Amino acid sequence: MYQVVAFLICACCLCACNNEVPQKSAEKSALVVPTKKKDGQALDAKLHPDLVDIQQSHSQIQIELKYTTSANFLGEKLYSKIDKAYLQKDVAARLARVQKALQQTHPGYQLLIYDALRPVTVQQKMWDALDSLRPVERAKFVSNPKNLSLHNMGAALDLTILDAKGNPLDMGAGFDDIRHIAYPIYEDSFLRTGQLTPLQVQNRKLLRSAMQAQGFRQLPTEWWHYNACSREEAKSKYKVFYTENDIFTTPTSN
């Protein structure tokens, strides 16, 4: 009997200890949140004057930055400071007009941004990760850092559309899918073979028509990628951001 009583007492003590753990963890987490918010505000204050947070251009535009987590083709977090989608101000203004027009034709629909401004250092990591592909094939998916990408200047973005219920439209291939089925140039062929459905192609065309109406150019090998202009034009008018620090360092006047 004494052994049973002792066992019950020990069990109760263990349960009591276990019940205290979540409470302490919750208290610790609650203290971390304000610090992160404060850090984010500090970075916003240092944002390069050429850039703008996309959601400041239009509050209905949503973001889900794929490279702030490990849920991407590299399987690792690539951004340490970036947690918002940044674009050149004139590019963001055009994107806001895309969202406005989309709402008029499809009430409740919203743009969802997967990536926008991307430093050259991150571009290099992506390029190196695909070293199993020949450079010609690799360049169809990731621009060679030596040539620069419009992402590196805040003049390109990766995106899709959310329906009125907040679900991404079915595009027949996921973001960062390197298979040919993700290539816009092969849509008609895959439609004929049944590998893409009419609805999937229709969804792609909806995004394409909305973006092209504001002068954005789709990459022929990625249904989600749009450039604001040509590479040559971008190089002539926009700053190149080589690191995340470049994005959050306000230039000093001479």
Predicted regions, residues:
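Sec-dependent N-terminal signal peptides
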Residues: 4-12
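Extracytoplasmic cell-surface/polysaccharide-interacting catalytic and binding patches
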Residues: 18-116, 129, 133-221, 230-254
